[in-house]
């Protein structure tokens, strides 16, 4: 499983391998209660070695599977943005985090309305996810469960990596890039609340702190239930795909926002490759982002092609 998860190249290092390796390493190095020459240290060393080998094999396997497909999105984890934009990223971070958690409020909404109450609960939940991991880190010395300690460090490793990439890099292009922080925050919060529950003096606090997590889970379940079963059939991409299939047009080219979506919705019965429209005499060029160069050559058994101008 580790090898398969590491086939996604740079992204797998940033979001999967690095937190695990960093969590195990920090937990062992900072455990002053256990001597270096112990069974725990040997187990941790073997874990790091196995994960490192799995990471290497996974990246090799991923490179073999990808072939010539260009994965430009992965460069967002390894490049700096213009320093003049860094402060703008800092200012945008709190709102981006809230919007990622589902904040959707207008300036005309009342505090006592349903939308207002939801917004307030979302703000409290955001504070909960930001503060509880800090409290867990402060209580680190009292936590004896090695798994919880590894999880705490894994969270802070991925948080540090994502924040550097968001504030100083290219991750700020999409708020969904912050989702790894939300994921590890929830895991750390659950593990920490479980630790609190086993202590009699903090059991009531644990129950109270579980309320924000319960709200989020129930709210998300409600949102999923509200989604119509055939909602995807109302999208423009689905309608375009059905039209192309009816016209027996099975291979062509379109802009990024239509090409891959239609290909997936039509289960590759209609294959559309990405092209970029230009203002020069060429008119368009091959879009190599998440594409294979061979897709723009003559295809075996294909005698007609189309260009979607939508």
Where are these regions (language model features)?
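Hydrophobic/aromatic-rich transmembrane helices and adjacent perimembrane loops
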Residues: 14-15, 116-129, 144-201
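Membrane-interface alpha helices of multi-pass inner-membrane proteins
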Residues: 1-10, 16-21
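Membrane-lumen/periplasm interface segments of multi-pass, membrane-embedded glycan/lipid transferases
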Residues: 60-135
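Short periplasmic/luminal acceptor-recognition loop of GT-C membrane glycosyltransferases, typified by
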Residues: 246-282
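Transmembrane alpha-helical segments
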Residues: 192-197, 206-232
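Periplasmic/luminal catalytic loop of GT-C fold multi-pass membrane glycosyltransferases
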Residues: 287-310
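Perimembrane helix-loop-helix junctions
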Residues: 14-49
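Membrane-interface helix-boundary motifs at transmembrane edges
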Residues: 29-42, 139-149, 195-206
């Amino acid at each position: 499983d580790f090898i398969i998860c590491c086939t996604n190249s740079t992204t797998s290092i940033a979001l999967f391998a690095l937190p695990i390796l960093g969590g195990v390493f920090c937990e062992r190095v900072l455990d002053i209660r256990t001597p270096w020459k112990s069974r725990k240290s040997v187990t941790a060393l073997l874990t790091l070695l196995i994960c490192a080998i799995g990471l290497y094999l996974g990246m090799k396997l991923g490179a073999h599977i990808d072939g010539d497909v260009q994965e430009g999105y992965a460069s967002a984890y390894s490049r700096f943005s213009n320093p003049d934009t860094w402060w703008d990223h800092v200012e945008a971070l709190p709102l981006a985090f809230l919007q990622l958690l589902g904040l959707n409020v207008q300036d005309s909404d009342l505090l006592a309305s349903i939308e207002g109450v939801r917004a307030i609960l979302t703000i409290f939940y955001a504070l909960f996810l930001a503060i509880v991991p800090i409290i867990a880190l402060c209580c680190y010395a009292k936590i004896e469960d090695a798994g919880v300690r590894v999880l705490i460090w894994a969270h802070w490793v991925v948080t540090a990596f994502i924040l550097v990439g968001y504030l100083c890099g290219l991750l700020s292009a999409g708020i969904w890039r912050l989702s790894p922080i939300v994921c590890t925050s929830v895991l750390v919060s659950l593990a920490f609340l479980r630790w609190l529950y086993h202590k009699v003096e903090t059991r009531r606090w644990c129950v109270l702190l579980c309320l924000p997590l319960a709200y989020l889970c129930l709210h998300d379940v409600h949102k999923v239930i509200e989604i119509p079963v055939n909602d995807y059939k109302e999208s423009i991409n689905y309608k375009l795909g059905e039209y192309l299939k009816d016209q027996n047009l099975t291979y062509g080219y379109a802009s990024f926002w239509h090409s891959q979506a239609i290909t997936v919705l039509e289960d590759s019965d209609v294959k559309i490759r990405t092209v970029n429209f230009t203002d020069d005499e060429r008119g368009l060029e091959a879009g190599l982002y998440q594409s294979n160069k061979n897709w723009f050559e003559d295809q075996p058994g294909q005698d007609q092609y189309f260009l979607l101008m939508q």
